Amino acid sequence: MLLYLLITCLSFFFFSKSLSFPQWASKTKNLLSFYFSKYLFTNSLHQITPDLASPVLGKMSILDLPDLPLDCILELLPPSELCTMARVCSSLRERCVSDHLWEKHLKTKWGKILGPSAHKEWQCYLSSPYHLDSPHHKTSHLGLAKIISLMRSLSSIFRDDDHRRRYPSSIPLDSTMNFYLSLETGRFWFPAQVYNRENGHVGFMLSCYDAELSYDTDTNTFQARYPPHGKRAIAVEKDVTWERIRAAPVDASPHNLYVSDSLNELKPGDHIEIQWRRNKEFPYGWWYSVVGHMESCDGNLNHCQCHNSEMMVLEFNQYTVGSRWRKTMINRRDHREKGNEEDGFYGGIRKINCKEDIEMWKRLWPSSILE
């Protein structure tokens, strides 16, 4: 019996070494080896005589694993393989579509660019006629086959799906899996903000504008639709990269003045973003600026009283000295939209407290001073 057990374990060991496993499988190989070895050992203790023709090994599958190791394996699977695993049988399907597995993938890939407004828009999208299942609004579920057909572009693993067995199933519309796949396939346009819109056009350097975004998995970039400017058509930009996108830091409409709550605490050297629009028909964008010193101040921090002044200087140092865009004055006590049709209109202000946000603006700094 011991010889039989030794031969079996060694055969399994050398066979597993010869296989080429995906990255996630290498992390679970030891777990599976331990479980199967334990299974063989415990069964050998109960057998009086060896049964070389026993079909136990041939019938064993991943479903024979206890819940804990099985869940650990599923948590290591990438989204495309989770979808494939969900088609194996009904038992695995229930596990593979559960929210707790997909929430990790959603947060890892999409968390930094999905803000509260995106989640609100998703709920509206589910009940809109633009949803995938809108022609059949009587049902509240999407077929798994339809979802997987949308995921085929994610991985070549789906190219042979027609030769695999199909299981009827459904996924709740409000599930995290549905949310992830709708983002991944570009079916859902979500709200976010884009740095340096329109491919870094000189007129938008060091700005961030609201947009609706759709992901293109083939290029790993986004298509952006910007709010219309008055009677102008919606501006569309393609090939927007991940690093140019952020979730909106504040819940403010691009057409409304943001109510500032930090004006009294601002002092020279603070980094801020301020709303600005070309005219009343344009939406606001957020522009990077630094609080400067008053003309009457020599800049010596030991004697500076600028933070006590009713007026506040904002500097846009990406523009050359003497440019009309270089500086502007804001009344911190009675702040409201300020400007004219020639210089544009300045709106609400928010202080930047996050070092990562400040570093992002610095990385976007133009290579040459603007006029």
UniProtKB/Swiss-Prot annotation:
Pfam families: F-box. It comes from the Eukaryota. It comes from Arabidopsis thaliana (Mouse-ear cress). This is F-box protein At2g26850. Residues 59-105 form the F-box domain. PANTHER family: ESTS AU081301(E20138) (PTHR31482), F-BOX DOMAIN-CONTAINING PROTEIN (PTHR31482:SF2). Gene3D superfamilies: 1.20.1280.50. InterPro entries: F-box-like_dom_sf, F-box_dom.
